[in-house]
């Protein structure tokens, strides 16, 4: 593998750049200065930039937070997140109102986009896992530790509830 010290060493070798978010562009709170600078250099050289991420967020949510991290929203052609892919799958798979499913949604209530993830999905969202036909796990409940999920997961296992994560 070739190590580079600056994006300028390879900028003329490619037209398109796929960039991961977490740990490459930012740490969740601050954008890395070298990443901001590199993206600005790529933009000034008319390169096509794409973000790819295993984030549970939808693509729009990821794009909307870029300015807070020091990046320009319009620097990127597209953003693909695992959260967006799951949302698209659920949207397509559960269109039928006749067989509307009960969904137990796990999300961090303190995040800006927890409830927004539900928009456009055709489910009855329920408060108890016992009532669910499926579980949508986006981000952990902020006040729970991993061990606190055991009772919930036992119910899901015993009822053979499908979980999307």
Give the positions of each predicted feature:
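HAD-like aspartate-dependent phosphatase fold
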Residues: 1-165
């Amino acid at each position: 593998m070739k190590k580079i010290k600056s994006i300028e060493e390879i900028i003329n070798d490619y037209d398109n750049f796929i960039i991961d978010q977490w740990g490459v562009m930012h740490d969740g709170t601050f954008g890395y200065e070298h990443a901001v600078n590199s993206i600005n250099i790529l933009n000034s050289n008319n390169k096509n930039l794409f973000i790819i991420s295993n984030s549970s967020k939808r693509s729009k949510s990821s794009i909307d937070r870029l300015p807070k991290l020091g990046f320009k929203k319009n620097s990127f052609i597209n953003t693909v997140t695992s959260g967006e892919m799951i949302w698209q799958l659920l949207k397509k798979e559960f269109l039928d109102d006749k067989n509307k499913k009960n969904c137990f949604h796990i999300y961090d209530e303190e995040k800006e986009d927890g409830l927004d993830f539900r928009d456009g999905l055709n489910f009855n969202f329920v408060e108890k896992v016992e009532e669910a036909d499926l579980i949508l796990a986006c981000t952990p409940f902020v006040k729970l530790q991993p061990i606190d999920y055991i009772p919930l997961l036992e119910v899901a296992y015993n009822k053979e509830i499908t979980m999307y994560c």
